A protein has these predicted regions:
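RNA pseudouridine synthases
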Residues: 1-163
Length: 163
């Protein structure tokens, strides 16, 4: 998936600030087994992180120590057994996508921690940092970075079916 590195400490400070204020649009792809309740939608939950379990829990209403989490999802492909979701992350919380999709009834393929029944053969989960877009802080030109899908037959098939 997409990983950004800064060449200098000044560039790192600028990049970190852009992430902090939401100037970087991050898109993720996730493969889920269950059909989402709608073709697209916005999920708004309050997440509580547990350090001991290294897990977050999603609630529909505000809670003490909870942080608001917002994402937008859209079904962009489907196979006989799985759905490919494009996820536009509005906030960046601990395990946010994993937690919110599980709360919606759509745990990510291979994600045992958040309710998928079995692991993937490689032990990973089917969540991919697909792209990052932002305005370059110096040149003011748009920057768009798109990562290829993982070298896995299901990912390749889902990408081919993408609408």
């Amino acid at each position: 998936g997409v990983v950004l590195f800064a060449k200098t400490s000044k560039a790192l400070a600028r990049l970190n600030e852009m992430f902090r204020v939401g100037e970087v649009k991050k898109t993720y792809w996730a493969i889920v087994k269950n059909c989402p309740p709608a073709e697209e939608g916005e999920l708004v939950n309050w997440l509580v992180r547990t350090e001991k379990q290294n897990k977050s829990y999603a609630y529909d209403t505000e809670r003490t120590n909870a942080k608001k989490a917002v994402l937008h999802y859209k079904v962009i492909a489907r196979s006989d057994n799985y759905y490919l979701l494009a996820i536009d992350l509005k906030t960046g919380r601990h395990h946010q996508i994993r937690c919110q999709l599980a709360k919606m009834g759509c745990p990510i393929k291979g994600d045992l921690k958040y309710g998928f029944p079995r692991s993937n053969p490689d032990g990973g989960i089917s969540l991919h940092s697909r792209s990052a877009e932002f305005i370059h802080p110096v040149s003011k030109q748009p920057v768009s970075i798109v990562a290829p899908v993982p070298a896995d037959s299901l990912w390749k098939a889902m990408e081919q079916m993408k609408r």
